[in-house]
Structures are given as C-alpha cells and as structure tokens.
Amino acid sequence: MATTRKDLRGRTLRKGEMQRSSDKRYAYSYTDPLGRRKYIYANDLVTLREKEAQLTKDQMDGLDIYVAGKATVNFVFDRYMSLKTNLRQTTRSNYLYMYDRFIRDTFGKKKIAEIRYSDVLQFYNYLLDKQGLQANTLESVHTLLHPTFQLAVRDEIVRKNPTDGVMAEIKKSSEQTTGVRHALTIPQQRAFMEHIANHLVYCHWWPLFTVLLGTGCRIGEALGLRWDDLDYERRTISINHSLVYYPVGESRNSVLHISKPKTEAGVRTIPMFDTVKDAFEMLHEEQKESGWNDVEIDGMSGFIFCNRFGNVPNPQSVNRAIKRILADYNAGEEVEAKKQHREAVLLPDFSAHHLRHTFCTRLCEKETNLKVIQSVMGHKDIQTTMDIYAEATEEKKQESFERLAATLDIF
C-alpha cells in the first residue's frame, strides 16, 4: 500500500511533490515530452503549487516552457526556412545573407521563449543607432523575424509574437520614412562618376556604373548581361535573366547562378543610350585585346563584365566597391574643403540599388507616361512606379517654385 508523502510541517504532498531536508525548499518533478526528468522549485508550498498550475496550463495548451526554453531564434528561423519550399533561390539567398549578417550571431542566439516585445524593440534600436542600418534595411530584418516568431506561435512554442507592433513604434519614435530609397541628386551623380573616371584605382568600375545609371537595371540583371543581349542596330538591351550569388551546401560557400526574372514584367527590352553604348564598346575593345570572358554559369557564357581575376563580379563585391569609392571621395573632399575654407560636400552612403532608383528618378523627371516608365524599369506593380514618380515630380515642383519666386515679383 502506497504511503502518503508529507512535508516537514505534516502537510500532505501531492504526487511529484517533495520537500528537501537540506534547505527545506519544495520541489515538483515531472517528465517532459522528450522523456526527460525536470524539476521546478519554490521556497514554500503555495508558490510551488502556483507554478504547478501554470505548468499544467502550459501543457494543456500544448506548450512546455522548459522544452521551449531550449529553442533559440536561430533554430526556429532555420526551421521556418526549411518549410518555405516555394521561395525563389534569389529570395532565399537574400534572406540567408540578411539573417547571417545582422541576426544569427547576436539576437539569434537568444532563447525564443525568453524574448519579449521590449527585447525586440531594443534590438531594432541597436541596429539603427549602433550599427547604422537604414530604415529600409531594418524593414528587411523585420521581414525575417516576424514570420519566424509567428511560426513559433503556431507551433505553440510561445504564446504571442513579440515582434508585433515593433516597427510601428520605431516609425513613430524615429519619424523615419521606412522602406524609401532616395535617389542621388544630379550633382551627386556627376561627382560620383567623375571621381571614378579620374581615379587610377577605381576607373575600371566606370563602365559598370555607367550601365547601372544609364539603364536602371537591377545589379543582378546588369552583371548577368551577355554580348548576345545587346542589339547595336536597334540600340536596345534585352533583359531576360539575372545573376544571383547565394550560399550552397553545408560549407555555405556562395556561388554564382543564373535566375529568371521574378515576374513577366522583369523580361523587357530597354533603350541603349549613347553613353551606355560607349561603355559597352570600351569593354568590347578591352576583351578583344586581352581575351574574351570564358566563364560559364549554368550553361550561359559570353558575359560582358569581368573582374581582374577573370570572373564575373558578384553583387556584394560591387556594393563593397561603392563603399570604398565613397570613402575615398569623401576623404578627399574634406581635405579640399579645408584647404579652400569651405564646407565639404559629401556623398551619402548608398548601394547599387540606389543607382537603379536614381535612373528611375531621372526618367520620371523627363517622361510623364507612367506605363512607359514601368515597362523600362520592369516594375510589376504600377504603384512602385507612381511612388517614385510622385517623389521626383514633387522635387521638381519645388525647384520650379523657387525659380519663380526669384524672378516673379507680384507683391
């Protein structure tokens, strides 16, 4: 016959409860879903039973807080990515790159069950203030973390999604226009290109940046261009594929691949301006003398752009080059400004995608037909075109008003 277990004060203990004689603390033992023995402790019996009640509630909800406590954000994100079987390889590559760069080695190591709303808010503010992330980049980080936590909610690992409402708070407190890439001004654009053209180290980048600023191509579309995509007679460029760079295998080493456009709008023919034609002809003459690019990627060859190692450049290397060029330009500008006793005119930080946005802005300043702009840019959604057009025309309107105010005296 089973004996009734009692505490040191003679009170009857329930199954799994005990009181240790060494420190008089109460304990409750149970077996988790993985068959492991677990314990919870309290200094008094009332508190212990409150913890037991909470544990029972969690178990009835299909949630064991102790098992959940072992799962990190990294674990849940990797699980989330493994379930996203319909992702394009380009998108998957971008997701993994963003996560590994900004989340995995810091916030990703935290136990997901211990993260609260304030933790997420603090992390986002850290990325903005300490890491210098732009608002649109933070949006990309949020795009990864929110569905990761949502999966944890659906799997009943956590009760609520701690990322809910965080971006709204960030926008409210910082008053930033998130997700908007601003174009370079015409003086900034000219300063950037003139610096490259006249620089002994960076001048080899001039053709690529000329093509980017003169076509509005996405960086992957530009790097993937082949000589067969050019029609000098019709002065057109065929955009029908893109170059992507993503990690593969357990080593996570990144390799170049060819990707088809995400939408039908991405397949398009765009005009070849004179300066862009000059850039292509310059590269054609160089390869004619030094040897044609013989790199083959997924069955495609004859690529226009080639680095000093004989390989096709990857998008990340282009963005790194932009950062080096900007740093060099701004450092030189500060020296010159000091010599001339004037304020330095520095170039802002930007990426290759800003050059696409810059081209679109210049196009919007000259062209009023939104469907033409949408076709050239390959925008799936006309709203994207309209947003850029509205921003560009608003700036032009302000310039017109300023000129009018300077010449027209009606008072």
Predicted regions and their residues:
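Short N-terminal "domain-start" leader segments
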Residues: 1-22
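N-terminal DNA-binding module of tyrosine recombinases/phage integrases
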Residues: 18-118, 285-300, 394
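C-terminal catalytic core of Y-nucleophile DNA break-rejoin enzymes
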Residues: 38, 44, 236-238, 247-248, ...
